[in-house]
Amino acid sequence: MDNKKSSQLWQITCNKSQLKLIAKALENYSRRLGGQFSRYEDIVIRDLAEKRMIAANTEDNFDYQKFSEELQKTLIDLKKLLFPEFPDGSGSYGFDHTPEIGNSYQIYRTIYHELSKENNDNSVYRRPPLPSGTLGPIKVEKIKKDYGKEQ
């Protein structure tokens, strides 16, 4: 990427729900690039599994334990196929497989950090994100003006 293009600034205006969705998508992207494929680390898989389990609650023959074990086994097999370099772990903060991990981490963690400050919660996101990636930090701030009902 040339310096002129990388120094251009862009702005996205969205509501809080949309901001959370962007952060979730980037978190999932970052985790998948780092080889984190488990029912608990992969947000999309976790949400789909929970929906399936809730829907299956009405089925007499649904075996929650069997479903959970089979899902986890399948995800481990998928991870081994896609990430043979991570036999028993994953790449995470500081892993140098691709700068996209650090770049996406920087963005989603900054969003979560700002939401955590706004909610005055005591989560892991209360602290600013560690510097990572090659693109530098982003700026996330709440716009004071109300642009309509937030979803």
Regions found by a protein language model. Give the residues of each.
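Positively charged, low-complexity terminal tracts
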Residues: 2-151
